[in-house]
Regions:
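Acidic, small-polar-rich N-terminal luminal/periplasmic segments of exported/outer-membrane proteins
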Residues: 36-160
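Outer-membrane beta-barrel translocator/receptor signature
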Residues: 122-125, 131, 136-222, 244-247
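Transmembrane beta-barrel wall of Gram-negative outer-membrane proteins
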Residues: 175-204, 214-272, 287-301, 354-361, ...
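C-terminal beta-signal and adjacent terminal beta-strands/loops
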Residues: 210, 484-485, 560, 611, ...
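Flexible loop and strand-edge segments within Gram-negative outer membrane beta-barrel domains
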Residues: 242-246, 259-304, 312-344, 378, ...
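Surface-exposed extracellular loop regions of Gram-negative outer-membrane beta-barrel proteins
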Residues: 270-272, 312-316, 371-373, 378, ...
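Outer-membrane beta-barrel signature, preferentially recognizing the C-terminal barrel domain
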Residues: 281-299, 339-344, 392-400, 448-469, ...
Length: 743
């Protein structure tokens, strides 16, 4: 199923974590309940909405949070701008994410730079989500689905009219973590050309949980007698390493010639600091540049679209303000500097050919070129970290060549179908590596360097969808998809099992464990069956109910295993965490998403009142071991009441999450208790301004985030100095305010 969310152009990029209309719940549930797009691309039926979503729903720092309340989607919490979306229990590289058509890759051994982190929420105009049954035309090399994020489309003036000038500015403040930010957008256009600038900056301190979850005291104490090298004080409810600072800028230029549009988009990102509460390292710098040239044209035979893009990331990690920096008995080892350089380039061409009034044929080709260098400079005088530079990945290569064809048929007013096939070839390789020194790392490096590192996967995707609309009050959809994903660079090429310290640094999961890759990994293949039923009143204004059950079998699912299972010897640990590798297994996931809305009353002097709700359930199992899959969101539900009167919008929202008892034993995943949260939002909108107010977690409830991972926000995180057993808590009460001005 595909949902699309459009955001009104109020630049305030959202000030409140979910904000007004029941936060993203209302915005996102409306993607199904109120503004449903068909599964079939290019066929769109939009029902009447009870409200129009706006950027005030958005959490300014984290674009992924725009999806946090969408049925079937949850989030792996990471840094303040770097959450990872999860679709039906599958996350990270198992989801294809495109930002303005660019197919981006995270260049980090901890995946601190996911694709959604490269666009600020204030620059997002709409998001499309394809869950499970994904048309081959919207992406391959993924098994969970596709997320398409787009900035605003160009606006041109009418011929003969004056220049069209728009400007917007917003600011916000969140009390819990002292988060503050500002964003700006301005554009100018005539009937042939346009130019737009967007910029934003956000900064926040550590957030506070709804209660104490650890002792108060110094964040980290070094082994020497020099107390000036200790880390500062953290309160018992302060979540260490949850601070962040981010700056984003973008320029867009476009030329419109009759039925042809040529656009150039440039993006810059600067993150000088971002703590990671569930990783042993923190981001100390992230510089990214994006170049994106696209063409779209309409012809007598159909549409043609083409794109060429390039993205470069320079990423640095070190121990941040809340983690021990000075190591060694005399406190002379200055942390563990880590650097990454990633380059992603791509070319896409797609043609939509109108074969007849009934039939559309989509054909296309894609090429993606990815290069990665991941190296750790020596940190003397530590014997284990000198004298050489440690090469974690040297000239990592991942090239993908795809072609696809897709046939969409509108048989009559009731029946639609879609059939698609995609062929994908993924070629990977990496250069020779070395450790800090030969004595401690030479053996593992030699084994890797003598291995055949050139890998080629020939993958096939297929999709079959059908939609039946017997009348205006009901729609039924069903489909099957076979999707494949090749391993990423770190899953295949992370080589070092020499000691716990270096294994700790390769962790894509936030569980605190150490990992080493596996050159023998195969591509994952997922088989998904899904159906959707949607019932509503005939005029699609009073009520809607949508239910989507699904089941997915994954052959060669990449999961954590004991090192010995894949012939590797890894150090034992005494801190409660484990050192692991990866291997292909068989997995099964199944669940159901339910969402709905009802207009309780409308019109008159009391305005309108609506009720909105959603329920999500997913279960994941490793069929080879009988173990549960990692980081599966427990049963959860959201309910909201929204009142509108004139310019006022007022919402009260409740979120309920069941306890997480189905956890993965292999990773020593921690259980979490169930909880309920209450949020209140209010806004007033004038013609050129909007004021937003909100209180989130009204009762300051303490809870553990089910997908938050292990708490590693403070202490000596390099090795075994932090003990296993503490989960990352959710944020406590926060009072939020924001103001938007537009011209």
């Amino acid at each position: 199923m595909m949902q699309q969310f459009k955001f009104k152009k109020n630049i305030l990029s959202g000030i409140l974590t979910s904000n007004i209309l029941a936060s993203c719940l209302l915005c996102v549930i409306s993607g199904i309940a109120f503004a449903e797009d068909l599964i079939l691309p290019g066929v769109e039926v939009r029902a009447a909405r009870l409200y129009e979503s706006s950027p005030s729903f958005r959490e300014t720092s984290d674009t992924a949070s725009l999806l946090s309340d969408e049925p079937g989607i949850s989030l792996y919490r990471a840094g303040g701008v770097s959450s990872l979306p999860v679709i039906h229990g599958l996350a990270d590289d198992r989801i294809r994410i495109k930002v303005d058509g660019m197919d981006l890759i995270s260049s980090c051994a901890n995946h601190m730079t996911p694709p959604l982190s490269y666009i600020d929420p204030s620059n997002v105009n709409n998001i499309k989500v394809f869950a499970g049954i994904t048309p081959v035309s919207v992406g391959g090399d993924s098994i969970a689905g596709t997320i398409l994020v787009n900035s605003a489309a160009p606006e041109f003036s009418q011929a003969g009219q004056d220049l069209l000038i728009n400007a917007q500015m917003g600011t916000f403040y969140r009390s819990n973590n002292d988060a503050r930010g500002i964003n700006l957008s301005t554009s100018v256009a005539n009937d042939k050309a346009y130019m737009r600038y967007t910029g934003s900056t956000v900064e926040a301190n550590n957030y506070k949980a709804g209660g104490k979850f650890k002792p108060s005291g110094l964040a980290a104490v070094n082994a020497s007698t020099d107390r000036t090298k200790d880390r500062g004080h953290l309160a018992g409810d302060e979540v260490g390493s949850s601070y962040y600072k981010s700056r984003n800028q973008a320029l867009a230029f476009g030329v419109n010639l009759d039925n042809h549009l040529l656009e150039l988009k440039l993006g810059w990102q600067d993150i000088p600091s971002q703590g990671f509460v569930n990783q042993r390292m923190d981001m100390t710098d992230n510089d990214s540049q994006q170049y994106n040239l696209s063409y779209a044209g309409q012809y007598g035979w159909g549409n043609l679209a083409a794109r060429a893009y390039h993205e470069r990331t320079r990423h640095s990690m070190q121990f941040g303000d809340d983690k021990l920096f000075w190591y060694g008995a005399t406190g002379m080892v200055a942390g563990m500097p880590m650097d990454t350089e990633g380059k992603t380039s791509g070319v896409n061409v797609q043609g939509d050919i109108n074969l007849s009034q009934r039939d559309v044929l989509r054909v296309g080709t894609e090429y993606q070129r990815y290069r990665l260098d991941d190296y750790w400079r020596a940190s003397p005088p530590a014997p284990a970290m000198s004298p050489n530079t440690f090469w974690n990945v040297n000239n990592g290569q991942r090239d993908r060549y795809d072609v696809f064809a897709e046939w969409e048929a509108k048989w009559n007013t009731q029946w639609l179908s879609l059939l698609g096939l995609r062929s994908s070839t993924v070629k990977m390789n990496a250069g020779n590596v070395q450790g800090y020194n030969v004595l401690m790392y030479g053996a593992a490096a030699t084994v890797f360097n003598k291995s055949d590192r050139s890998k080629t996967d020939n993958n096939v995707d297929s999709t079959a969808l059908v939609r039946f609309t017997p009348d205006a009050s009901q729609t039924y959809e069903a489909g099957y998809a076979m999707k494949t994903r090749s391993p990423n660079v770190y899953e295949r090429f992370a080589w070092a099992n020499s000691n716990t310290m270096v294994m700790n640094m390769n962790n894509l999961y936030g569980d605190g464990n150490g990992y080493v890759g596996n050159l023998k990994l195969k591509a994952e293949t997922a088989h998904t069956l899904s159906a959707t039923a949607n019932w509503r009143d005939a005029v699609q204004q009073d009520w809607q109910l949508t239910a989507t059950p699904y089941i997915t079998y994954v052959d060669d699912y990449i999961d954590a295993v004991a090192c010995a299972k894949v012939g590797k010897v890894c150090a034992a640990r005494t801190d409660g965490f484990v050192n692991l590798s990866l291997d292909n297994q068989t997995a099964r996931l199944y669940g159901v998403d339910v969402s709905g809305q009802m207009s309780l009353f409308r019109g008159g002097g009391f305005g309108s009142l609506s009720a909105i709700g959603a329920l999500n359930y997913v279960r994941g199992k490793n069929l080879d071991t009988g173990d549960d899959l990692y980081n599966i969101m427990p049963l959860n539900a959201k309910f909201a009441l929204e009142h509108r009167l004139g310019g006022w919008t007022n919402t009260i929202q409740t979120k309920l999450v069941d306890s997480k008892n189905n956890v993965q034993a292999m990773r020593k995943e921690l259980k979490t208790a169930g909880y309920g949260l209450v949020n209140i939002y209010s806004s007033y909108e004038w013609k050129y301004a909007r004021l937003d107010l909100g209180v989130e977690n009204v009762f300051d409830k303490f809870y553990a985030d089910p997908l938050g991972g292990a708490y590693l926000g403070q202490g000596a995180t390099m090795g075994t100095g932090v003990l296993h057993g503490v989960t990352v808590p959710g944020i406590g009460r926060s009072v939020n305010v924001g103001l938007t001005l537009k011209y």
